[in-house]
Amino acid sequence: MKSKYLAPLISASLTGFMLIVALLAMFSPTLGWFATNKSVSASGLSVTSVGIPKTEQEIIDGGEDIFAEMMPGERRSVTLRVKNLSGKPIIFRLHMSAPTEASDSVYVEDGLWHYFGTQVRLNSVKIGDSDTDSLILEGADKYLLPLEDSQYTGGLPPTALEFDSGDGYDFSSLSESQLTDAINLAIGEEITLTLEFEFVDNGEVQNAYISFADHSSGDAVKASLNLSRTLICYFDFAE
């Protein structure tokens, strides 16, 4: 007899709980994001080098999936290992590849152009166990797809952009970004660099970024979206 009445009671309790969550989501932008969105999925980081051949560089933590399934406000780090095998003291500078139409594809909805790179900021680059930030980028240039400083109201990114031309973001004038000044490496020396990225939470519901790498509706794929960058180590012999 008890089970006869217990099942309806549990069902009613669950229904009531789900109703409360739905009502809270409607009136809370941040909670609304987590209640109504899945996650952002995107590509990640790779690494290459230019200059002296006898060096090693590899991503040892993070990397390919660093931007996958991020949520607003979430921070993630990637660690790069660099070693000097040249037999001479060297210097290197860390750069990041420029945004392109291939690396920063767009999702268009109701005339608004959504680029995930405008939401992701490189907060810092730290060497080894140091707390010192070696990142030389400032302001809007810290975002993976930079806009004008004025477009980041209060330092927060927009949720969407509307371009008068109807052609989306103009990538033609962008070049790769230098992330650090020259870093010295003695013979045989090995160091690590840790880069911290943040999906900046601007307090708005960001529904355009649902399953960013495979934004689909039913069987019809609306867009195959992407966010990726290459870290570039420029090596040279120290004078």
Q: Over which residues does each language-model region extend?
A:
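Residue-level detector of alpha-helical transmembrane segments in integral membrane proteins
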Residues: 1, 22, 139, 150-151, ...
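Terminal low-complexity, poorly structured segments
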Residues: 2-5, 131, 170, 175, ...
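Short, polar/proline-rich extracytoplasmic segments that appear immediately after membrane translocation
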Residues: 2-71, 239
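C-terminal, structured domain-capping segment
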Residues: 76-91, 95-101, 172-239
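Solvent-exposed, conformationally flexible loop/turn segments
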Residues: 67-75, 147, 186-190
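Extended amphipathic alpha-helical interaction segments
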Residues: 152-172
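Surface-exposed interaction patch
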Residues: 25-26, 74-159
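N-terminal cationic leader/targeting segments used for protein routing and processing
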Residues: 3, 124-127, 185
